[in-house]
């Protein structure tokens, strides 16, 4: 599609204790990230889907975490003023308010990750 950018990346990590033939602790689950981006002059819109698999290849003292899907949105407006580049950024994270647990979190047994969130940022590049 004209004027759209499609981005995709994947992350797969394996760690095995060769001496004991067991998984190493704190290995992240498999992840696929898909993004569609639309630029309109100085306005950039990005919709992102993150697909994270369950982690059941567990090291000592670890507990299994379920897989999850997240939907995120980011809109940024870029402009120049006084020889500097400025950006206004609006983000909505976890749009669907998914309850999920990050396998690498030290507090996953206590509470899930944050639900839907809104962020407004200002950046100045000089």
Q: What are the residue ranges of the model-derived segments?
A:
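Conserved C-terminal beta-signal and adjacent last beta-strands/turns
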Residues: 2-12, 22-126
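Surface-exposed cleft-lining segments at the edges of enzyme active sites
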Residues: 18-19
């Amino acid at each position: 599609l004209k004027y759209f950018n499609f981005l995709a990346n994947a992350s797969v990590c394996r760690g095995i204790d060769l001496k004991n033939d067991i998984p190493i602790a704190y290995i992240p689950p498999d992840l696929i990230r898909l993004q569609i981006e639309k630029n309109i002059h100085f306005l950039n819109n990005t919709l992102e889907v993150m697909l994270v698999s369950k982690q059941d290849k567990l090291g000592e003292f670890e507990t299994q975490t379920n897989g999850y899907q997240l939907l995120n949105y980011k809109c940024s407006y870029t402009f120049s003023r006084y020889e500097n580049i400025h950006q206004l950024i609006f983000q909505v994270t976890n749009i669907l308010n998914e309850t999920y647990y990050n396998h690498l979190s030290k507090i996953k047994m206590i509470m899930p990750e944050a639900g839907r969130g809104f962020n407004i940022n200002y950046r100045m590049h000089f």
